[in-house]
Amino acid sequence: MKAFLVLDNGTIFEGESFGYETESVGEIVFNTSMAGYQEILTDPSYCNQIITLTYPMIGNYGIHPDNMESSKIQASGLIVKEYVDLPSNFKSEKTLSQFLKEYKIPAIQGIDTRKLTRFIRTNGSPNGGIFVASEYSPSFLEKVKSFPGIINADLAKVVTTSSKYIFGTHTGKKFKLAVYDYGVKTNILRLLDANGFAVTVYPAKTPSEEIMKEGTDAFFLSNGPGDPAPLDYAIASTQKIMEKRYPLFGICLGHQIIGLSLGKKTEKMKFGHRGGNQPVKNLETGQVEITSQNHGFAVIDDQKQDEPISFLNLNDHTVEGILKSGYPLLTVQYHPESAPGPNDSRYLFQKFYDLVEKTKKG
């Protein structure tokens, strides 16, 4: 079946459908990872986005339940150069096409993904849509132009859990950790659990005072989709957490929320960072880590002496982490849990545990 990718400037790419035969609109982004398409598709940070995978051949190793980063596909659509329908992997339980159809997600193959990626890199991430149809219709562009975009949209409330839950085991764990779910990835929870925390996950709008009354030793602010600026409830809760001096760790959107809570500003990036090869310098140690990233907004450095940058992106010098003088705080813009991506930064989970332990000892 034919499929059309339509951008908001009227550009049309014609290809072939290999997902569910439907239509979908969203922000068009690209990810440079060579593998990890299942983890990428199920990452809640991709809510309302259509993903272009720059690696030219996708689907080679199929789908396996262990690689899910949430309970379903979160992206609005998928764009690839060439889809492989015969995966070679003894663990594979279904094809990528079957996976997409199961969750009713459209996908298009056979288009020039290099041309599309260059367009995004030059012009920024456009709104667009995938339309499965036998022929093009002018209504496709009208539907794309009606998409409101992700700026000033609270997408965390779309992907957050509806009720609190315990992750992993609490038996024998020394510290209770409250995780705010703004779109948390499963591997983040796995690593928090594996590094000794008794993890309880809370809906995004849970008042921090309520969690404090229940009892916790520290807070974690998760990754998530879209613009942090409209998340007033998250910023207010974070400020109250910091007033009470709880140890605090934020990843990706969580890092941005902490930045806003400190009075900093965020900005929409031209095309963001999405892939598993972003070099980041640890300004404390001087070491360079290769990181996995997925974000389209960034914290602006306000050069406050008591809130220095802790990590710096070496490609475009954007802020990748911030500190607060005298406060037990750890933030990173990137994804230390990888899934997919390199494991250079997984030490941060143990570092946070040590920070909590040090804080509790006084």
From Swiss-Prot:
InterPro entries: Anth_synth/Amidotransfase, CarbamoylP_synth_ssu, CarbamoylP_synth_ssu_N, CarbP_synth_ssu_N_sf, Class_I_gatase-like, CPSase_GATase1, GATASE. GO terms for cellular component: carbamoyl-phosphate synthase complex; cytoplasm. It catalyses: hydrogencarbonate + L-glutamine + 2 ATP + H2O = carbamoyl phosphate + L-glutamate + 2 ADP + phosphate + 2 H(+). L-glutamine binds at residues 45, 224, 226, 253, 256, 294, 296-297. This is Carbamoyl phosphate synthase small chain. Residues 176-362 form the Glutamine amidotransferase type-1 domain. Composed of two chains; the small (or glutamine) chain promotes the hydrolysis of glutamine to ammonia, which is used by the large (or ammonia) chain to synthesize carbamoyl phosphate. Tetramer of heterodimers (alpha,beta)4. Belongs to the CarA family. Keywords: Amino-acid biosynthesis, Arginine biosynthesis, ATP-binding, Glutamine amidotransferase, Ligase, Nucleotide-binding, Pyrimidine biosynthesis. The gene is carA. One of its GO terms (biological process) is L-arginine biosynthetic process. One of its GO terms (molecular function) is ATP binding. The active site is at 252 (nucleophile), 335, 337. Pathway: Amino-acid biosynthesis; L-arginine biosynthesis; carbamoyl phosphate from bicarbonate: step 1/1; Pyrimidine metabolism; UMP biosynthesis via de novo pathway; (S)-dihydroorotate from bicarbonate: step 1/3. It holds the Pfam family GATase. SUPFAM superfamilies: Carbamoyl phosphate synthetase, small subunit N-terminal domain, Class I glutamine amidotransferase-like. Its EC number is 6.3.5.5. Small subunit of the glutamine-dependent carbamoyl phosphate synthetase (CPSase). CPSase catalyzes the formation of carbamoyl phosphate from the ammonia moiety of glutamine, carbonate, and phosphate donated by ATP, constituting the first step of 2 biosynthetic pathways, one leading to arginine and/or urea and the other to pyrimidine nucleotides. The small subunit (glutamine amidotransferase) binds and cleaves glutamine to supply the large subunit with the substrate ammonia. Residues 1-172 are annotated as: CPSase. It comes from Leptospira interrogans serogroup Icterohaemorrhagiae serovar Lai (strain 56601).
